[in-house]
């Protein structure tokens, strides 16, 4: 493994652990489980020799980190039965602009359009 891949792998690993702390900060069992999965995956990928496979594994770990930080939101059930969502400054909040435009082409079968099935031939 090249020196650049070693440092990239270490950086990706640290970022993944940081992402789990952000995403699951108030849920210790889930936080522990997520960190264990990342550690197991990282340990398993230590056996990789091909530079392309190593780069792909690093890229996937970086994508997982980004997804955890931007898309996972923890919720707490309140006494009134409603849920309080714990958003943070890095949570990705969509503006739903494509839905407001009524652009059904981007929605595919979610737009209620008939979908051609294999059995329709």
From Swiss-Prot:
Transit peptide, start-end: 1-26
Give GO MF terms, alphabetically: protein folding chaperone
Q: Which GO terms describe its biological process?
A: mitochondrial respiratory chain complex III assembly
**Keyword terms of this UniProt record:** Chaperone, Mitochondrion, Transit peptide
Q: One Gene Ontology cellular component annotation?
A: mitochondrial matrix
Matches recorded under InterPro entries: Complex1_LYR_dom (IPR008011), Complex1_LYR_LYRM7 (IPR045298), MZM1/LYRM7 (IPR050435)
Q: Does the keyword Transit peptide apply?
A: yes
Where is the major localization of this protein?
mitochondrion
Pfam families in alphabetical order: Complex1_LYR
Q: Where in the cell is it found?
A: Mitochondrion matrix
Family the UniProt entry places it in: Belongs to the complex I LYR family. MZM1 subfamily.
**Subunit details for this protein?**
Interacts with RIP1.
Role noted for this protein? Assembly factor required for Rieske Fe-S protein RIP1 incorporation into the cytochrome b-c1 (CIII) complex. Functions as a chaperone, binding to this subunit within the mitochondrial matrix and stabilizing it prior to its translocation and insertion into the late CIII dimeric intermediate within the mitochondrial inner membrane. Modulates the mitochondrial matrix zinc pool.
Q: Specify the protein name.
A: Mitochondrial zinc maintenance protein 1, mitochondrial
Q: Which organism is it from?
A: Scheffersomyces stipitis (strain ATCC 58785 / CBS 6054 / NBRC 10063 / NRRL Y-11545) (Yeast)
């Amino acid at each position: 493994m090249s020196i650049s891949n070693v440092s990239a792998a270490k950086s990706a690993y640290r970022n993944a652990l940081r992402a789990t702390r952000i995403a699951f900060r108030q849920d210790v069992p889930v936080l522990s489980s997520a960190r264990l999965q990342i550690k197991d995956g990282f340990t398993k990928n230590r056996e990789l020799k091909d530079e392309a496979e190593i780069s792909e594994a690093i890229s996937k770990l970086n994508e997982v980190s980004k997804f955890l930080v931007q898309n996972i939101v923890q919720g707490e059930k309140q006494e009134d039965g409603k849920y309080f969502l714990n958003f943070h400054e890095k949570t990705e909040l969509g503006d739903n602009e494509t839905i407001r435009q009524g652009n059904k082409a981007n929605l595919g079968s979610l737009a209620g359009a008939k979908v051609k099935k294999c059995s329709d031939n």
